[in-house]
Regions:
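Extreme N-terminal segment that seeds HTH/winged-HTH DNA-binding domains in transcriptional regulators
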Residues: 1-38, 48, 89, 125-130, ...
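Flexible loop/turn connectors
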Residues: 10, 14, 175, 250, ...
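Short acidic capping loops at alpha-helix termini that bridge into adjacent secondary structure
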Residues: 22-23, 199-200, 233-237, 292-297
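Minor-groove-contacting beta-hairpin "wing" of winged helix-turn-helix DNA-binding domains
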Residues: 27-28, 57, 62-68
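Amphipathic helical "hinge" segments at domain boundaries
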Residues: 29, 68-135
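Periplasmic-binding protein-like
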Residues: 77-78, 132-141, 161, 202-206, ...
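Hinge/beta->alpha junction and helix N-cap segments in small-molecule ligand-binding domains
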Residues: 81-92, 110-121, 142, 177-188, ...
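Flexible loop/hinge segments that line or gate small-molecule binding clefts
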Residues: 141-185, 276, 302-314
């Protein structure tokens, strides 16, 4: 058990035993740190944990107080997308959300989106209100504004958070949204390939036409990015698949790879729309007799947890689903800092990171 956990449990014991009374003002953070013999940073983290769990209230300019006994019990509803598609990010961030809720003493229920969409609005609103939820995690994204569940959630008048959203989600829904800086993340992945010495990079993107923005860029902008990084910039280096059409996706990705490798100047690396596309590139490369990374480097995007178990482990731009899940739980526990905030900010960025793994060869010293 680490020092922060020790402090949290000891202060919680003092509160539950009544030694620290509801409404009682505690010493400041520095004094508490000295009393417990821990660093000030450790105490700050412990106090934040207690605030998130509702044990204490921190009022800036006034101090730290033991929460009143009538403090609202936190209870969240997870609304799942209702599909078994392994590419849905919610599947990978929800375990971290649930773990954090458990640590913070939050009760969690789950509902399937299909159920909500086929239930009468008035009755569903009444039922959800009767359950006294204090927050909703809407584990779906890409709203067009016509979804029947939206008026249900709005009538509840409680915080709704999308833990992995599209750029337009907050504007369309009015809900809080966690997301990556997708444009910067995509650029950073390409920059990493350049740093590894790659001058010819093929892109396998998901899209149905050349006008759609993919990872924040049009096709022409993707070509400009290749040129900006000193890479071969030609439309022959870009292939499109539609990952939403799962039927035959494996064969379509293989055809994309064959098209790229048939070029007069075939790519040294493939930068994939997602880690799931990268998985199919692995399979196609194996059937084509290409070794990764000796013959072809492969880079993914998203941070699918299973990528590290591929052979070789998949290099990727990790959108950090773990951080998204934990942050979502903490934000729903502390809505005062965003839901009730008058500045109107609804979009919150989860930092990405480059996972440097063996699927990308390093052709020069970095």
């Amino acid at each position: 058990m680490n020092k922060k956990t020790n402090v949290v449990e000891r202060l919680r014991e003092l509160i539950l035993s009544g030694e620290l009374q509801p409404g009682q003002k505690l010493k400041n953070g520095i004094e508490l740190a000295n009393d417990f013999g821990v660093a000030h940073l450790t105490m700050r983290r412990a106090l934040r944990e207690l605030e998130l769990s509702g044990d204490i209230t921190i009022i800036h300019g006034r101090g730290i107080f033991v929460s009143e006994r009538h403090t609202e019990k936190r209870k969240f509803l997870i609304v799942r997308p209702g599909m078994a598609d392994s590419a849905v990010p919610a599947h990978y961030l929800l375990p971290y959300f649930l773990q954090r809720c458990n640590e913070l003493g939050v009760e969690v229920d789950e509902a399937d989106l299909i159920f909500l969409r086929h239930s009468p609005v008035a009755g569903t609103v009444r039922q959800l209100k009767d359950n006294q939820y204090t927050g909703i995690l809407l584990a779906c994204s890409g709203s067009n504004g016509t979804e029947p569940e939206l008026p249900i959630f709005r009538r509840l008048n409680i915080p709704v958070l999308i833990p992995r959203g599209a750029d337009s989600d907050s504007k369309i829904t009015g809900f809080g949204v966690l997301k990556s800086d997708e444009r910067q993340a995509w650029q950073d992945g390409l920059k990493y390939l350049k740093e590894c010495g790659m001058n010819k990079v093929g892109l396998i993107l998901s899209g149905s036409n050349n006008n759609k923005r993919i990872r924040g860029f049009t096709i022409d902008e993707h070509l400009a990015l290749l040129k900006q990084n000193g890479m071969l910039s030609d439309k022959s280096m870009i292939e499109l698949v539609n990952i939403k059409n799962a039927s035959g996706l494996r064969e379509k990705v293989e055809q994309c790879l064959k098209n790229l490798m048939a070029q007069a100047e075939p790519p040294e690396a493939i930068y994939c729309f997602s880690d799931f596309v990268a998985l199919y590139v692995y399979l196609a490369a194996q059937r084509m007799g290409l070794k990764i990374p000796e013959d072809l480097s492969v880079m993914g995007f998203c941070g699918y947890p299973g990528g590290k178990m591929l052979s070789p482990p998949l290099a990727t731009v990790d959108c950090d689903y773990a951080a998204a899940g934990k942050t979502a739980a903490e934000m729903l526990c502390n809505p005062e800092k965003w839901y009730f905030n008058e500045d109107g900010i609804k979009d919150f960025i989860i930092p990405h990171k480059i996972k440097k793994r063996a699927s990308v060869a390093v052709k020069k010293e970095m």
